[in-house]
């Protein structure tokens, strides 16, 4: 592989891992990435047929997670930091997971945002253990888990409280 080809792959990894530079916003790069994800999901949802929203959320969540693992691994290795704070593609994946099956109203988008960020920051069992997995797997999976926790709570709220 040529040096310029590996450099362009590295640049791509940094671009995706930092969610197009959002990871460099301070303070709270993870919160910025999650907030932008909420806005992008809300915007994209107006272009997606409502009958396809569930599928779109699942596909987007899986795609971001599968792309996020190798790019996070690359950036962590190149930066010499196990879980760099500027890698925020994990927040994008977790936030998207939260919205699987959620209605598109500001109330549920805000609730999903707050739930996801809370679980991501607090890291209840076993999220801290997932974070210890090697490379991009650990970087991504604790946020995937936080997204799943937020998804479950949001769905419980929708089905039992918000009726």
Please state what every model-predicted region is:
Residues 2-35, 67-98, 118-148:
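Interhelical loop and helix-boundary elements at the membrane-water interface
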Residues 11-12, 50-56, 82-84, 104-107, ...:
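Membrane-helix interface segments
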Residues 57-63, 109-118:
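Hydrophobic core segments of alpha-helical transmembrane domains in multi-pass membrane proteins
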Residues 25-44, 56-60, 64:
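Short Lys/Arg-rich amphipathic alpha-helical segments
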Residues 36-49, 96-102, 154:
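Interfacial segments of multi-pass membrane proteins
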Residues 44-59, 126-136:
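Membrane interface segments of multi-pass transport proteins and intramembrane proteases
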Residues 155-163:
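Juxtamembrane boundary at the C-terminal end of a transmembrane helix
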């Amino acid at each position: 592989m040529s040096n310029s080809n590996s450099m362009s792959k590295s640049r791509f990894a940094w671009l995706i891992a930092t969610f197009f530079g959002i990871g460099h916003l301070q303070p709270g790069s993870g919160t910025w990435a999650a907030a932008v994800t909420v806005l992008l999901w809300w915007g994209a949802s107006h272009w997606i047929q409502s009958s396809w929203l569930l599928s779109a959320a699942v596909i987007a969540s899986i795609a971001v997670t599968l792309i996020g693992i190798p790019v996070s691994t690359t950036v962590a290795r190149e930066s010499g930091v196990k879980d760099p704070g500027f890698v925020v593609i994990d927040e994008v994946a977790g936030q998207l997971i939260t919205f699987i099956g959620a209605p598109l109203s500001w109330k549920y988008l805000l609730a999903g945002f707050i739930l996801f960020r809370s679980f991501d920051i607090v890291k209840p069992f076993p999220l801290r253990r997932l974070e210890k997995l090697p490379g991009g797997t650990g970087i991504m999976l604790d946020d995937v888990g936080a997204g799943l926790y937020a998804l479950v709570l949001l769905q419980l709220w929708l089905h039992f409280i918000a009726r």
